[in-house]
Design a protein with these regions (language model features):
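A short beta-turn/strand-edge loop motif at beta-sheet boundaries
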Residues: 1-5, 236-239
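Aromatic-lined ligand-binding clefts that engage carbohydrates, nucleic acids, or primary amines
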Residues: 5-7, 245-246
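Local beta-strand/beta-hairpin segments that build beta-sheet-rich folds
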Residues: 18-20, 71-78, 83, 137
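Beta-strand/loop-rich accessory regions of lumenal/periplasmic or secreted enzymes
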Residues: 39-52, 65-67, 80-310
Length: 310
């Protein structure tokens, strides 16, 4: 019987709530069904939205009155619908100023308006410094020797150790946790508009295979740094536990904002209970203290991510 519920709707664009309202429910008896029209304003919002925007409609049913088991306003069911899926756009990397470039046998340094970035031209081509307005962004713990680092390994979980331990065993046999990393080249060029292009290529060597990583940095005078990464597997490799690059940032950046599923952690096989939206939390809270250590803090369908010191 729908008479005991209120039906609320919200429309979000790119993770931000833009409109909301309530739908009057008809008297539908148990076991029966009826089609309920949506407000016309939803179609109007879709028509006026950018074709690249992400639109989500969330329908929620809440109790009208107190019940023995819950108070009025308690949500008993919800569902989210994708009205228009947002498009990923290529960055418009237009430079409007000049950059200073310094290079010697050991370092490549580039600086602009209030920022500087430096690479070490050693065996790995690691980033050694990234500062904005005098504040260092990167951290350099002893167990994180270079940045960015190609990561194709993670600690095995219970699932990886099941079925005869085959996944974790393969990773160990191929030495996925201990690659030998070398630098092929680190070079730069200056575009006609003054932007600096830095190309870095590294190799992660494992027992019988390797992963070649190509980094393409585009650096603008306002401090924008666009990084595109390409991975090329070669030789014999096991099923990879993961693949990506990792940076280690200063602990000052403790606030985590993302557009994607949340706010709780979610995974490919457990994500429909997490709505797509614009969420905010602390970095420390993303870790879940399970009785046995497992994956935690994962977020699915993330379109953008911000870390801030505020």
């Amino acid at each position: 019987d729908l008479s005991q519920y209120r039906c609320l709707w919200t429309l979000s664009i790119d993770g931000k709530q833009k409109d909301q309202g309530e739908i009057t429910l008809p008297g539908v008896a148990p076991g029966e069904s009826e089609t309920i029209p949506l407000p016309a304003s939803i179609a109007g919002k879709k028509a006026s939205a950018k074709p690249t925007s992400d639109l989500r409609l969330t329908i929620s049913f809440i109790l009208k009155r107190d019940a023995l088991w819950a108070k009025a306003g308690h949500e008993v069911a919800w569902e989210q619908f994708c009205i228009q899926e947002g498009a990923f756009l290529s960055s418009k990397l237009e430079n409007r100023g000049r950059l200073k470039v310094r290079e010697d046998e050991e370092h490549l340094s580039i600086s602009g308006s209030g920022f500087s970035i430096q690479w070490e031209k050693n065996a790995t081509g690691s980033l050694t410094s990234l500062t904005y307005h005098g504040k260092e962004i990167l951290a350099h713990p002893a167990d994180f020797p270079l940045q960015p680092i190609t990561q194709a390994f993670r600690a095995p979980t219970d699932n990886d150790k099941s079925f005869g331990n085959w996944l974790a065993k393969d990773w160990s046999l191929h030495r996925m946790d201990n690659p030998r990393i070398s630098l092929d080249f680190l070079k730069h060029e200056i575009r006609e508009d003054g932007a600096v292009i830095v190309r870095v290529q590294t190799r992660n060597r494992y027992k019988e295979g390797m992963i070649v990583t190509k980094y393409l940095y585009t650096i603008l005078s306002d401090g924008t740094i666009d990084l595109k990464t390409t991975f090329q597997p070669q030789g014999i490799l096991p099923e990879l536990p993961r693949l990506g690059i990792a940076f280690c940032l200063s602990s000052d950046y403790r606030t985590f904002i993302w557009q994607g599923r949340g706010p709780q952690d979610n995974y490919p096989d457990r994500k429909t209970s997490a709505a797509v939206g614009l969420w905010k939390g602390s970095v420390a809270d993303q870790y879940v203290h399970y009785p046995r250590p497992q994956d935690s803090g994962n977020k699915e369908e993330v379109r953008r991510l911000m870390l801030t010191d505020r």
